[in-house]
Amino acid sequence: MKLNSIEVIGKRKSSIAKIILFLPKDGGGEILINGEKAFNYLQNNLRTLKVVCSPFELLNINNYKVHAYVKGGGLSGQADAIKLAISKSLSVFIEKEDKKKLKVNGFLTRNSLCKERRKYGLKKARKAPQFSKR
């Protein structure tokens, strides 16, 4: 039995993306994020749209349909979370050599960087109050 859709979760900073990837026989690449077209949801920002579509471009896949549900964080973090989820879901459908391409280019690795917590006695995570000598 061959799968035609898969559901995967991706995370980045405080963003969580749950995507459903469909690989139909025909049709163009369509990405819906929270019910809107990706271009509109990402506020017409081509850079973040390119981040979301980069796994498909790397593997030269033109027939796909993605439904993404994202919450938390900003647009950049959400785009990276969607990219990770798409890459994870593609790794189920593709051959080992293509999976290796994704791994080498860092698409299957979660970026664990997040905001550092604020410490007491400081204004921010590392910003100290101004030192007064006298």
Swiss-Prot record:
Question: From what superkingdom does this record's organism come?
Answer: Eukaryota
NCBIfam families of this UniProt entry? PRK00132.1 (NF001099)
The gene that this protein is the product of is rps9
GO CC term (a single one): small ribosomal subunit
Q: Name one GO molecular function term.
A: structural constituent of ribosome
Q: Does the keyword Hydrolase apply?
A: no
Q: Does the keyword Oxidoreductase apply?
A: no
> What family does this belong to?
Belongs to the universal ribosomal protein uS9 family.
What is any Pfam family matched here? Ribosomal_S9
Alphabetically, which GO biological process terms does the record hold?
translation
Which keywords fit this entry according to its UniProt record?
Chloroplast, Plastid, Ribonucleoprotein, Ribosomal protein
Q: What is this protein called?
A: Small ribosomal subunit protein uS9c
| Subcellular localization(s) per the UniProt record | Plastid, Chloroplast
